[in-house]
């Protein structure tokens, strides 16, 4: 399980596709092998760059399973952001059952106030369960949600399962 003691490089993995839109599992294997050979300390999959919204739940779970099976000692963080908490809960539980170390949650673009952002993360933790470690994904240029240092502090203070921040500029 991912903890606050995690450190090192966790590359952001894209999701390779075949011409017909299916996941290119051979390329998944080569990509994960490359990250391991390069000395990655972990790997982040199904984030914004990981084309997660293009996958249905079965495809996402299959991708997680393939990555974890390829490098079972590498901690994988799985993006689980979804339009609703039910889908987030389902993918979080499935990813953890497949061997993920934790999940990553990005705020939806509709959030504007500090209280809305903090409340969203509290609701997300309630939905997925406080036993699942999560990463706060802060990507204001793409999501349009501005998380101030105070908001991030509040999320971390209010949710013990928050173990990492992925800040993107």
Question: What annotation goes with each model-predicted range?
Answer:
Residues 2-146:
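Active-site beta->alpha loop and helix N-cap motifs at the rims of alpha/beta catalytic domains
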Residues 30, 149-154:
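A generic local structural motif
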Residues 152-169:
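Active-site/ligand-binding-proximal alpha/beta "capping" segment
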């Amino acid at each position: 399980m991912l903890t606050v003691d995690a450190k090192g490089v966790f590359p952001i993995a894209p999701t390779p596709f075949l011409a017909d839109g299916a996941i290119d599992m051979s390329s998944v294997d080569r990509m994960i092998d490359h990250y391991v050979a390069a000395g990655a300390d972990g790997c982040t999959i199904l984030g914004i760059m990981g084309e997660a919204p293009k996958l249905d739940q079965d495809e996402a779970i299959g991708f997680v399973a393939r990555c974890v099976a390829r490098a079972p000692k590498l901690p994988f963080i799985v993006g689980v952001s979804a339009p609703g908490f039910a889908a987030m809960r389902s993918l979080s539980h499935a990813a953890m059952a497949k061997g993920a170390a934790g999940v990553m949650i990005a705020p939806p673009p509709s959030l504007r106030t500090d209280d809305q952002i903090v409340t969203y993360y509290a609701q997300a933790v309630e939905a997925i369960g406080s036993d699942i470690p999560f990463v706060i994904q802060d990507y204001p240029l793409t999501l349009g949600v501005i998380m101030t240092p105070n908001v991030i502090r509040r999320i971390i203070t209010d949710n013990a399962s928050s173990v990492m921040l992925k800040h993107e500029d």
